[in-house]
Amino acid sequence: MSANDDLHWIAPLLEFLRNAVRQDVPMIGHCLGGQLMSKALGGTVKANAVREIGWGEVRVADNGVAREWLGDLQAFETFQWHGETFSIPPGATRILEGEHCANQAFALGRHLGMQCHVEMTADLVKTWIASGADEMREHHKSPAVQGADQMQHDLQPRLDRLHQVADKLYDRWSASL
């Protein structure tokens, strides 16, 4: 699914997102949600140079907005599952970047759009591996696509570290409610 798909619910959702931002109702989006936020706010969504499936490092951008959201954190391992990416919409600031996908997250005031998945659980990882097996096979030569064994290696410790970052982001976001 793409934010660019011609589905009957996308245009009303984009308008809903624009209205929420205009009224300063805090919004948060993960992956497709981040892409929809970007598009609603004047950004674009297009194919990423490579498919990203599995674990990968993202870096915290070197700017004050990123520091407000992530403190002194420099980089962390996160989960990815996408073939498209968003541009940073006008007025927003990139707060996370990656080797294979430059725009991993942006902030616009109290609003947070992410390409990466900080919300993962062990059950989600296993479910996505099972339901995405064909996609993993199709894109296995991508430098950013992992196999099931790689994704599940040390799964709980990886998730524990990721949840520390997620808590930081969600705490910052929910403080604005």
Residue spans for each PLM region:
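Residue-level signal for well-ordered alpha-helical scaffold segments within enzymatic catalytic domains
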Residues: 12-15, 19, 39, 123, ...
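Catalytic nucleophile loop
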Residues: 20-44
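Flexible gly/pro-rich beta->alpha loop and the following alpha-helix that scaffold active-site loops
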Residues: 1-28
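Pocket-forming structural segment of enzyme catalytic cores
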Residues: 41-124
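Generic recognition of short, well-ordered alpha-helical segments
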Residues: 8-11, 32, 40, 90-91, ...
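Glycine-rich, phosphate-binding/catalytic loops in enzymes
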Residues: 9-14, 45-46, 96-97, 130-132
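Acyltransferase
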Residues: 120-177
